[in-house]
Amino acid sequence: MEGSTGFDGDATTFFAPDAVFGDRVRRFQEFLDTFTSYRDSVRSIQVYNSNNAANYNDDQDDADERDLLGDDDGDDLEKEKKAASSTSLNILPHRIIISLDDLREFDRSFWSGILVEPAYFIPPAEKALTDLADSMDDVPHPNASAVSSRHPWKLSFKGSFGAHALSPRTLTAQHLNKLVSVEGIVTKTSLVRPKLIRSVHYAAKTGRFHYRDYTDATTTLTTRIPTPAIYPTEDTEGNKLTTEYGYSTFIDHQRITVQEMPEMAPAGQLPRSIDVILDDDLVDKTKPGDRVNVVGVFKSLGAGGMNQSNSNTLIGFKTLILGNTVYPLHARSTGVAARQMLTDFDIRNINKLSKKKDIFDILSQSLAPSIYGHDHIKKAILLMLMGGVEKNLENGSHLRGDINILMVGDPSTAKSQLLRFVLNTASLAIATTGRGSSGVGLTAAVTTDRETGERRLEAGAMVLADRGVVCIDEFDKMTDVDRVAIHEVMEQQTVTIAKAGIHTTLNARCSVIAAANPVFGQYDVNRDPHQNIALPDSLLSRFDLLFVVTDDINEIRDRSISEHVLRTHRYLPPGYLEGEPVRERLNLSLAVGEDADINPEEHSNSGAGVENEGEDDEDHVFEKFNPLLQAGAKLAKNKGNYNGTEIPKLVTIPFLRKYVQYAKERVIPQLTQEAINVIVKNYTDLRNDDNTKKSPITARTLETLIRLATAHAKVRLSKTVNKVDAKVAANLLRFALLGEDIGNDIDEEESEYEEALSKRSPQKSPKKRQRVRQPASNSGSPIKSTPRRSTASSVNATPSSARRILRFQDDEQNAGEDDNDIMSPLPADEEAELQRRLQLGLRVSPRRREHLHAPEEGSSGPLTEVGTPRLPNVSSAGQDDEQQQSVISFDNVEPGTISTGRLSLISGIIARLMQTEIFEEESYPVASLFERINEELPEEEKFSAQEYLAGLKIMSDRNNLMVADDKVWRV
C-alpha cells in the first residue's frame, strides 16, 4: 500500500529470512520438483479459480449492461437479472495435501522436522509452495486478478503419523509443539466469527496509511507475546488515526471440541476431550456428532503457572490443537453426509443391475442379510432410503417425500438391529433413544455462547439429520411433552423456534425410523392395535408404515432361527483357526486422510462388474454368499422354504450406498394415469374396509401410497411410476395395516377383478351379490344360499374379495355351471405356491384350499377338506342352515390338554376372527369356528377337537370369550 508504514515493535507473522530458513525453502522446492503431482494440483486450482472468477465477472458486467436497457424486456429481463445476481463466486482454497510418506521417501530429516518441529519447518515449506504458485500464475483474464496466487498458500498433511497418531487421552506433555493426529467425536462447535489479522489506519493530516499486525497464541505456531488487542489512535507524531475497516484483514475463526471415542475409552472412565482451533478455509467443516480425524500442532496457551489464591501450588497450562486439516471418518460418522464418488464403471454397473426384473428383491435381500426374516420390513427400509419426490407448490404447500417407519412388537425381534443397520448404511444418519432424548434435543435448543455470552441456537438431532435419517430406539419411552415436539418435523419438516428473543424456522427434512415396545411388554393379540401401542392417532398417522412384529411360537421357524444363531456363533473371521481366540481389532490410523483422494482407475481395474460376477477377481458389486452369516437372505430368496437350495445374490454395502445415491440424485419419477388408478382404488378399498376401522386411514395414507410407489420406481431407475410400482406399494401398505401378504397373486387378482368389473351388471352391487348354485339336474330352481363368509384376511372392498364374489355372480352363464367345475385341480405352479403359503402359515382363503385339495379325475367319494380332524357325530344338514355348512357335534368329545404355545396360537387366531364380519351378530357356531381356525393353519399345525375345546375353556375362564348354546360369543 502506497505511503503505508508499520508501528515500531509490532509482531509480524513472517520469519526473518536467515540462511537456515532459505535452505529449507530450497529443499522443499526440490521436493515439489521431484513429485510433479503436487505442481499439477497447484496449477489445477489456479485454472479453476481464474475461470470461475472470469465467468463471475462477465455475468456481473452483463447484468450492469442490462440495467441500462430499462424495463422494455419485462419479466424476462427480471428473470435474467435474478439469475445473474444469484451467481456466486466459488473458488477453491489455496491449500494442497502433502503425503508424509512421499516426504519421508525424499528426505527423512525434513519429514522428521515436520513432525517434531513444525513451527520451524512448515513456514519455509509454505513459503516454497507460495513461490511456486507465483511463478506458475498467469492470469488469463484481466477481471480475474482477484484470485491471484499472491495470497499465501497453505499445506495439509496426510499419510502415516506413526507414534504421533493419538487420541485426546494419550496427548501428553511430550507432544507439545509437535504435529499430531487425533481421532474423536465433535461434541461442540462455536459460531464462525472473523478474527483480526491486520488493521489499517489513516492519518488525515499527513495523508498516510498505517497498519498493525495482531498475533496471539492461536495465530502462530510458536508461543509469542500476544499483541495488545487495542487499536492505535495516534501515530508516532501524535496525529489522529481513523480505522479503515475495509482495508483491514480478517480471517474466519472457529473453536470445536473433540471428545475421545467411546470404544477407545478404558473401562469405567469417562471420555476426555481437547479443543481445536480452526481458521480460514477449515471452519464450518464439521458439526456435533461427526467422527473426525484432526491433524494439527499441539501447543499450550501459556495461561497458567502459579495459583493466584495460593502461591505454593501450581496449576496446569491450558492446551489446544491448532488445526491443520480435518478429515471426516465416513465409516462411523453420524453427522457427515458421506458422498460416494461415482465412476463410469460404477454407473455402468448400476444401469445394468437396474434392468434385472428382480432388482427390488436383490437390493432388499442385501439389507441386513444376517437378520432372519422381516422381508417386508427390509423392503420398506430400502424404499425409505430411496425416498419419494419432495414438492413445494406455488401456494406455499410442502409435500414431503421422506418415508417414516414405525416398528412395534415383542422384545428380541431384531428391531434395534435393523435400526443399527440403517445407521451404518445410510449416507447421513443420526441415532437417538427415547429416554435419552428430550424435545429440544431432537429439534433445537437455545444456549449461551461461552465466548461472547450471546444467545445462540444449537441444532438437535432432526435438524442435524437434514436430508438424512433419524433412528429413534425405545420410542415408547419418550414422555408426551417431548414426543409432541416431533409432530411438526414429521409432517411439515421444519422446526419453528420462538424463545429467548429468537424466532426462526429451521429445516429438518429427514426420514424417521423408530422402534417401540407394546404397552404391556408383549403384544396382546386380543386387544386393538392402538391399545397395544399407546401412541396418539395424530402421531401414528404421520408414520407411513407401521409394522407389528410378534414373536409367535412356530416349531419349524424356531428351529431354523436357533440353527441360524448357532451358525453365527460358529463363524470365524478369515485367517483364524478353530479354537484360536479372536484378537481385538486395533483402531490405529496407519494412513490418515488417504480416503480424501480417490483414484478412479483403481476402481475401474481392480474389480469385476455385473457382467463378470462369477470370476475369481475381487468383485465390487456382488459379495460371496456366507451360509454362516447370511441365512436370512437365503430364506427370502427361496420364498420362505426352509429346505430351499437357491443361493441369493447379495450386493456389497459400498455398492448399495452408491446405488441409493445415484437413484436419489438422478431419478425423479412422474406419476402415470394407470398408476393413479391403482392408487385411488386401493385407497378407497382401505377406507371402506371393516378390518381397518380401528386404524387411522387418512389422506396421509394416500400420500403414503404415492411415496412408496415413487420410491419403487427409483429402485428400477424408471422415469415414470407405472402400475407395477403402485401394486408393490399397495401390497406393502396392506401388509403393514392388515398383515396380508398378497405376494405373487396380486397380478392375477387384479386382472380377474378388472375382468369381473367389465362383465358385471350395473344394477347390482357386488356386496349384495349372492353365490347361486345350480343343481346337477339343471332343474331350473336355484337352491337358497347365503353369501360366503370371508376369512380374517379378506377385505370387503379388496380385489381378492371382489374376485371371489363376482366369480359366482347370478348371470345366465354361471347359473348353469356344475358345482364340481369349481373343484378342478390347480396347475402345478399354482399348487406349489399355495403349498408354500400354507407352510409359512400365511392366510389362504377357503376357496383356494378347496382348489388345492380337489380330487384327481376318476377319484370317487365325497369331497372332504384334507387335514381337518374328523370329529364324531358328523351329520350333514340339508335344511336351510345359517352357514350352509356341515353341522359338527361336540357332544361326545371331552376337552383335552393344550400347551402354552398352542394356546397363544389359537387365542391370536380367534381374536383376529372376532374382528371380521363373521362375528357381526356377536356370536359364531363352535363347530364352524373350529373349521375356520384350521383353515388358516398348515397341515402339521392343525388343532384337534380336544385341543380346541381345551383352548375354548381356558379362554372362557379368562373372560376372553363366552361359550353358550353351541356358539362362541364375543365379550
UniProtKB/Swiss-Prot annotation:
UniProt keyword annotation of Hydrolase present: yes
Keyword terms, alphabetized: ATP-binding, DNA replication, DNA-binding, Helicase, Hydrolase, Nucleotide-binding, Nucleus, Phosphoprotein
Catalytic activity annotation: ATP + H2O = ADP + phosphate + H(+)
Segments of skewed composition (Polar residues): 775-801, 873-889
GO biological process, alphabetically ordered: DNA replication initiation; DNA strand elongation involved in DNA replication; double-strand break repair via break-induced replication; mitotic DNA replication initiation; pre-replicative complex assembly involved in nuclear cell cycle DNA replication; premeiotic DNA replication; silent mating-type cassette heterochromatin formation; subtelomeric heterochromatin formation
Gene3D superfamilies: 2.20.28.10, mini-chromosome maintenance (MCM) complex, chain A, domain 1 (3.30.1640.10), Nucleic acid-binding proteins (2.40.50.140), P-loop containing nucleotide triphosphate hydrolases (3.40.50.300)
Free-text function comment from the UniProt entry: Acts as a component of the MCM2-7 complex (MCM complex) which is the putative replicative helicase essential for 'once per cell cycle' DNA replication initiation and elongation in eukaryotic cells. The active ATPase sites in the MCM2-7 ring are formed through the interaction surfaces of two neighboring subunits such that a critical structure of a conserved arginine finger motif is provided in trans relative to the ATP-binding site of the Walker A box of the adjacent subunit. The six ATPase active sites, however, are likely to contribute differentially to the complex helicase activity.
Gene: MCM3
Compartmental location: Nucleus
Disordered, as annotated region: 52-78, 594-614, 749-825, 842-893
GO molecular function, one term: ATP hydrolysis activity
EC number assigned by the record: 3.6.4.12
Description of how the protein assembles with itself and partners: Component of the MCM2-7 complex. The complex forms a toroidal hexameric ring with the proposed subunit order MCM2-MCM6-MCM4-MCM7-MCM3-MCM5; loaded onto DNA, forms a head-head double hexamer. Interacts with CSM1.
Phosphothreonine, modified sites: T868
Residues recorded with modification Phosphoserine: S761, S777, S781
Designated name of the protein: DNA replication licensing factor MCM3
Domain MCM per the UniProt entry, residue ranges: 359-566
Residues that coordinate or bind ATP: G409, D410, P411, S412, T413, A414, K415, S416
UniProt motif (Arginine finger) ranges: 541-544
Comp. bias regions, Acidic residues: 58-77, 811-821
Note: Present with 35100 molecules/cell in log phase SD medium. Early fractionation of eukaryotic MCM proteins yielded a variety of dimeric, trimeric and tetrameric complexes with unclear biological significance. The MCM2-7 hexamer is the proposed physiological active complex.
